[in-house]
């Protein structure tokens, strides 16, 4: 049986921190489904379709990555994909506290799917999509935080607004 993982997130936008976790997950698992989700507590800058397209562009050279979106519960998506793992990135203790809640719920819903926490590399420990959007909104350079395709998309988005 293939080792399949789901790497979920809102990815609004995808950052080098996200890519760090995705790429490292791709070295561990035979197949990684990157699942773009809507976070109901956030107002996204990019549509789900735009986020999927950006992710596909920046992961196109990784053959065992598939980018999709899903509505509903993450655990149901993982079951549909026959995934045995959910891959989550952590930057700090505060991330762990937040992620533990979701993991605990997922364990109640289906205890056969494990959650793997991966610490991001230190150079990305401060990085978040919110910070990237804030810097880009005020015309700051985000080239150290996101791939060039994402930087261009941010510039275009804020020029429109």
UniProtKB/Swiss-Prot annotation:
The record marks 18 as: Transition state stabilizer. GO terms for molecular function: ATP binding; pantetheine-phosphate adenylyltransferase activity. Keywords: ATP-binding, Coenzyme A biosynthesis, Cytoplasm, Magnesium, Nucleotide-binding, Nucleotidyltransferase, Transferase. Reversibly transfers an adenylyl group from ATP to 4'-phosphopantetheine, yielding dephospho-CoA (dPCoA) and pyrophosphate. Signal peptide: none annotated. InterPro entries: Cyt_trans-like, PPAT, Rossmann-like_a/b/a_fold. Its cofactor is Mg(2+). This is Phosphopantetheine adenylyltransferase. GO terms for biological process: coenzyme A biosynthetic process. It comes from Bacillus subtilis (strain 168). Substrate binds at residues 10, 42, 74, 88. It is found in: Cytoplasm. It is an enzyme of class 2 (transferase). One of its GO terms (cellular component) is cytoplasm. Belongs to the bacterial CoaD family. It catalyses: (R)-4'-phosphopantetheine + ATP + H(+) = 3'-dephospho-CoA + diphosphate. Homohexamer. Its EC number is 2.7.7.3. ATP binds at residues 10-11, 18, 88-89, 99, 124-130. Pfam families: CTP_transf_like.
